[in-house]
Every structure is written in structure tokens, then in C-alpha cells.
Amino acid sequence: MYKKLAIATLLYSADYLPGVFALGHQVNKLLEEAGKKGDIETCLIVTTSLFNGTLSELAKNILQSIYTKIVLVEPLNCQEESIQKNSENLALLERPELSFALIKARLWELTQFEQVLYLDSDTLPLNKEFLKLFDIMSKQTTSQVGAIADIGWPDMFNSGVMMLIPDADTASVLQNYIFENTSIDGSDQGILNQFFNQNCCTDELVKDSFSREWVQLSFTYNVTIPNLGYQSSPAMNYFKPSIKLIHFIGKHKPWSLWSQKNFIKNEYHDQWNEVYEEFKEEHQLNNEVSKPKISDSDKTETPETITPVDAPPSNEPTTNQEIDTISTVEENVDNQNAEPVPNSDHSPAPNPVPLDFTKWLTTFINKDHLTNQPVNESREYSKENDNNIINSSSNRDQESPPNSTQELNSSYSVVSTQADSDEHQNAEEEDSTTDNASNSGEESHLDDISTAASSNNNVSNQPDGKNFSNSKENNISVESSPSNPEQKRSTDNIQKPSVSTNDLPDDVEPHTSVDDNIQYLEKDKEGYEEFLPDVYESNAIDNEEEFFDDDARDATEGETKTSAVADKQEDMKLTAEETNQPQQEMPNFKFDWEDSDYLSKVERCFPDDIFEYAVE
């Protein structure tokens, strides 16, 4: 085993500063746990312009307390040309910031160390077992690189975790190779594979004599976790006890603002947050620094200057800085108000509860054309919806079996004919005075029937113009109604659907909702449907007794009994026929509403405060 060992990481953008803090804190903790705190150094490689021009004094002091050695480096001499050359391949990754990762070639210049374990700043060692890599690669040569297969293409290695031997000659050859060749992915991983990985050699003759070698290590030393939640669950469960290190690949990191809101949380994401909270407690930053809000937007960063940068006259951040993640207490007051500091018990912050429960309830409903509707229009939608329901019920009533209604009409017409003939005979026997009285009683009784029909129409919910009665039903004689109460009830039921809009007040429209009809009935306290037949039947019978003598009444009662028996038999036949007829199936509302525009309006039926009780 080599004597001078180091664990190094790279900081080329302030966006990765939280990852550098958490990684350095965790590595020091595990080194102390393994008893190798003095045997293995921690090293941070950072660009000179970033360290002197962007980071604050507080950030610099913290970095110097975490890492035993900080190495300032300049961009590669060929970096501008390499960025332009690799721009097309880099665009495929949609990761423009990776163009600066070519500075990772500077790792082989760390000749002050004999062996280096490189870790990306978005990695998190889980336990001290990751230090076994030094034992596994104890006989490594300068032409070898120890790395783990990439999850995207296993014939290539992931450059986030690498074991390497610093060497000046290798560093020089590598930098020239970067200048002369185009990276597969436009970034450091592609070009390092082309340089060290024998699998990337397309020429079979050259492949056999390839001078450099990739030593493949176990995947448990670099378990890549994409932030979209994709992973091989069975393998993760099986090898979970053996995992030594987690790598948060992708553009969204655990500390980024997008991840804090949208990331599919898992135990490793929570573990990173716990480590970061421990780091803040150790450095007493809970009252000074809130959780950093790193923007996830893809920014086209300008290449850093190649010329060496002298020490600036002051350490204040420049005006062209990308982001000042950690600053003084006064600069972070707004950050504290913007996002609360997590609890000191290291428990992960709970997911925010959506306050707009109406939007949450109708997540699968297309509401685009209703989002900008005013409140009064939403009420109109509610009324239209109620009218649609009323119209549908009236249509169903109208579509009732026509045979039954026709047969009833025919039977009632026969009864009317018989009653008219009896009336004609009685009229010849009576004198003119009796005829006049009879006519006056007839008119009064027709008024009663008209009043009852109008009252029943107020109770019904049928729309205008839906008159189901024919001319024969409207011409029913006076004698047929009082002589047979059951016949009168049936006649009233047939006349009931007819609507008389003249009885409604002027301020009530015919096409109103059910609530308006109920309010109107409350104003008119008389005329309930179930009591109407008894009222006008009793009055009609009293009037009849005044105008008919005993002989005429006996004859009429005989005819009435005969007609009543015939009517009962006819009703029994109708009931049997209705029983034999197939019952009309009601529409399946569970599926019919999918074809209508009901869903576009249903959200407006919910009051805005319906879910307020659930919000604390």
C-alpha cells in the first residue's frame, strides 16, 4: 500500500458547494470512525477564479477547516478549444456545465500524493467500508484507473469514483489527448474512457496492444441513483447491505431547489440531508445559513480565463458571480425567511401540503378553458348543469311507454261518451231552471279542475311546452269526474305534466333550477299534490247532490258503479301489460357522463371553502 494517500474532490462551480460541504464532513467522520484520520488526507481541487473571486470569507474558512489541503488550479490550456470541439456531443447530454469538468484531468498532476481516491461532489459515502478501495487497488500502476461501470453503458466506467496514481507524464499525455480528440459525451467521462478504457478502442489490432487499462470495481462502490426515481428495485434490495457509496447523478441534486419540491424522496436522499444538517450544526450555521437554493436552470457559462489569476485586492464577490451560496449573517436573512431551517433533530422536512384542495381534487379534469372564468360565470355553469339534469329527467318521463297512455286515453274517452249521453237524457227531463243551475255548477267544477291542475304544475319540475295531455283529456265532462274518484285521480295524473307558465310570478323564469321551484312553493302554501284530489272531489259531490233528484242520482250511481268496475278491470289489464312489457333500462350514469361536457363544469359545483376544515 502507498504511504501518501488522499481522498480528493473537485469544485468548478459554486452550484456544487453544498455537495462539497456534505462530502467533506462525511469523509472526515468516516475516517475518524475507521481510525485513519492521519493516514489519509482530504484534498479539494478548486479553480482559482472561483475560490478568490466568488466564494466569501466564510465559505473559504469552512472549506479550509474541512479539507486538509486545498489546491488551486487553472483551466486546461486547451479548454476553450476543447469546449468548442465538444459542444455538439455535450448538447446531447443537455449539461453545459460539464464542459468545465475537463479540468478533472488535473488530478494526475497531484504528484504530492502517491495514490488518490477521487469522489465527485455529488457522492455520499455511507460507511467506512468504502476505504477498502485503497486495499483493493494497492498494486495499481500509473497506466491503470480503477472505476465502476456506468449504469448507462456498462462497457464504460463512471468517472464519479476513480482510483488513480498521479503522474506528470500521464497528465501531460492525457491533456494532449483531450486537445486532439473529441469526447464521446463532450465531457470528462467520455474522454477519460477513450484514454484509459480498452473497450473504447475500435481497432482490434491496437486493442490487443493497448497500454492503458480500466480495472473494473464493484458497483457497490458507486451506486448511481437517478433523481427521477428509476432504479433496479430487486437488486437494490438484495445488495443494500453491501452498498458503500451513493452517487446522485443527473442535473438535479439533493440540495437543488427542484429536488426539494419534486424529487421522489428515498432514504439516500434523506441521508444526504441529515449529513448536511450535521455539517451545519458542527459549524454553528443553523442561525446563519439556510438550506441553499441552487437554481436548476441550464445556464450557458462563459469559459474561465486561461491566464493565471493573481490574488485579488479584496475577497468580496465580483459582480459577475454565478451564485454566492454561503455569505455573512446579514446576507442570509432573506434566505431564512424564504425557506425555514430544518429541525435540529435531523428529521427530514415534511412534504408541503397543497393548500388549493379544489385543484388537487380535480387533478384529472381538464380545466384549461375554465381557469380564467369569473365567479358569476361559474354560477351560470352551475345553473346550466342543473337545467341539463332537469331536462334529462323530463325527457325520461316523456319517453315512458306510449301504449299505456294511449289505452288510458281511449278508456277515458269511452267514459266521457257515456257520461255525455246520461247528461243529455237528464237535461231533457229537467226544466230550464235546473239546466241553468247545472250549467253554473259545471262551470264552477271546471274552475276547480283548472285550479288543481295549475297547483300540480307548480309542484312538477317539467320544462315549458311539454304538454302530454290531448284534446280528449281536456274535454272531460263534469259528471265523469265527481262520479268516479279513482277515475278523477287518473285523469289528474295525466293532466299533471302540463305546465302553465301564467301561474308563475314575473320574476321567476320558466327554466330555473329546482331550488327556485321549492322557494315558490313555500310562498304558495296550498295546493300540495297528495291533498288535491280529496278537496275537489268532495266539493263536486256536494254540488251534484243539490242539482240531481233522487231518481237521476240513482241512475247516475248505477252507471258510475258499472263504469267503476269496467275501469278497475281495465286498470288490471294495463298493469298486467305493463308487467309483461320489458322494463326500460335506466341510463348508466357512471359512464354516460364521460361523453358529455359534465366534467368541464363539475369543479365549479364545489364551494371554495369546502375543504377548509382539512387545513391547519
UniProtKB/Swiss-Prot annotation:
Region: Disordered, residue numbers: 283-320, 335-354, 371-525, 553-588
UniProt-listed Enzyme Commission number(s): 2.4.1.186
Bias type Polar residues, positions: 400-419, 462-485, 492-503, 577-586
InterPro entries named among the record's database cross-references: Glyco_trans_8, GNT1/Glycosyltrans_8, Nucleotide-diphossugar_trans
Protein keywords: Cytoplasm, Glycogen biosynthesis, Glycoprotein, Manganese, Metal-binding, Transferase, Vacuole
Deletion phenotype: Simultaneous knockout of GLG2 abolishes glycogen biosynthesis.
Family according to the record: Belongs to the glycosyltransferase 8 family. Glycogenin subfamily.
Stretches assigned to coiled coil: none
Record-given protein name: Glycogenin-1
Reaction equation(s) it catalyzes: L-tyrosyl-[glycogenin] + UDP-alpha-D-glucose = alpha-D-glucosyl-L-tyrosyl-[glycogenin] + UDP + H(+); [1,4-alpha-D-glucosyl](n)-L-tyrosyl-[glycogenin] + UDP-alpha-D-glucose = [1,4-alpha-D-glucosyl](n+1)-L-tyrosyl-[glycogenin] + UDP + H(+)
A single MF term (Gene Ontology): metal ion binding
Ranges annotated as biased composition (Basic and acidic residues): 283-302, 377-386, 567-576
CDD domains recorded: GT8_Glycogenin
Single Gene Ontology BP annotation: glycogen biosynthetic process
Localisation: Cytoplasm; Vacuole
Functional note: Self-glucosylating initiator of glycogen synthesis. It catalyzes the formation of a short alpha (1,4)-glucosyl chain covalently attached via a glucose 1-O-tyrosyl linkage to internal tyrosine residues and these chains act as primers for the elongation reaction catalyzed by glycogen synthase. Capable of transferring glucosyl residues to unbound acceptors such as free oligoglucans or oligoglucan derivatives.
Ranges of compositional bias, category Low complexity: 450-461
Glycosylation sites: 230, 598
Residues given in the record as UDP binding sites: 10, 16, 95, 120, 122, 247, 250, 253
Feature type site, description Important for catalytic activity: 104
GO cellular component, one term: vacuole
Regulation: induction: Induced during the diauxic transition.
Predominant location: cytoplasm
Uppermost EC category: transferase
Binding site for UDP-alpha-D-glucose: 10, 16, 95, 104, 120, 122, 158-159, 185, 188-189, 250, 253
